[in-house]
Amino acid sequence: MSLNFLDFEQPIAELEAKIDSLTAVSRQDEKLDINLDEEVQRLREKSVELTRKIFSDLGAWQIAQLARHPMRPYTLDYVRHIFTDFDELAGDRAYADDKAIVGGIARLDSRPVMIIGHQKGRETKEKIRRNFGMPAPEGYRKALRLMEMADRFNLPLFTFIDTPGAYPGVGAEERGQSEAIAKNLREMSGLRVPVICTVIGEGGSGGALAIGVGDKVNMLQYSTYSVISPEGCASILWKSADKAPIAAEAMGIIASRLKELELIDSIVPEPLGGAHRDVQAIAASLKAQLLDDLSELDGLNTEELLNRRYHRLMNYGYC
């Protein structure tokens, strides 16, 4: 399977191409006198070493590219690897079923829970069907319906954030995009069940916040969380999207910076090369984090949970 190497990974891509070429030759002619296995192993070790070197010093813009990687696991990938008995629930009961938001009831180690997350697509048709992970108001109202259901049936709520932002189309604005987001922010802050949010890719502005008010907020190592995309910021400040790398650094969009600012609680480490390199490994790491978070929150009664969440929200932006 192609790993779809990014621009800054091209030296790794060249090594991997050599490995693939030698492996193919070895399979085609097993009578070769040259021991290709040793050479392939040497190149693989060199590739791992080079990958480790490159990924030890990534900038914010490079991490932003990883957060958008086309092979990066999406919400439904994590649902398959972490949860069982997932039963998807559709529709906002008012207008439509927005495929950019998925959600439903599942089990986490046999415990019933509610799941809500953004969902992007991989192939062209799927990307269009999912609107590139940009929800319309009906998506956020579907999410609200599931939040209220979780509250009613005392189900812990897990949200997975991965969106460039809420859909900015005219129709979405006419149907009340800002109202839908604002209502979710208000209602999530008062849910009487544990709410655990994880940024798994792009955490874009209000579109991310609309399912991001929680008792615990985690970020994967190579995810981003920001009020605007680096390109959008650069276009406003410098009138050119080419300045996106500068904007990414200045905005502090990466997990380590947000942890320093106490805007998130935990950073989930990713496999070498990013989550797409080993989906099972990142899913196992994330599951362990979610279980730890849930175990901690289970020790709080409803009043303690709400008070803690309130103080968390009130401390945002406080110096």
Curated annotation (Swiss-Prot):
One of its GO terms (biological process) is fatty acid biosynthetic process. The keyword Amino-acid biosynthesis does not apply. Its EC number is 2.1.3.15. Keywords: ATP-binding, Cytoplasm, Fatty acid biosynthesis, Fatty acid metabolism, Lipid biosynthesis, Lipid metabolism, Nucleotide-binding, Transferase. Pfam families: ACCA. The keyword Transmembrane helix does not apply. Signal peptide: none annotated. Pathway: Lipid metabolism; malonyl-CoA biosynthesis; malonyl-CoA from acetyl-CoA: step 1/1. It is found in: Cytoplasm. It catalyses: N(6)-carboxybiotinyl-L-lysyl-[protein] + acetyl-CoA = N(6)-biotinyl-L-lysyl-[protein] + malonyl-CoA. One of its GO terms (molecular function) is ATP binding. One of its GO terms (cellular component) is acetyl-CoA carboxylase complex. InterPro entries: Acetyl_CoA_COase_a_su, ClpP/crotonase-like_dom_sf, COA_CT_C. Residues 35-296 form the CoA carboxyltransferase C-terminal domain. Acetyl-CoA carboxylase is a heterohexamer composed of biotin carboxyl carrier protein (AccB), biotin carboxylase (AccC) and two subunits each of ACCase subunit alpha (AccA) and ACCase subunit beta (AccD). Component of the acetyl coenzyme A carboxylase (ACC) complex. First, biotin carboxylase catalyzes the carboxylation of biotin on its carrier protein (BCCP) and then the CO(2) group is transferred by the carboxyltransferase to acetyl-CoA to form malonyl-CoA. Belongs to the AccA family. This is Acetyl-coenzyme A carboxylase carboxyl transferase subunit alpha. It comes from Sodalis glossinidius (strain morsitans). The gene is accA.
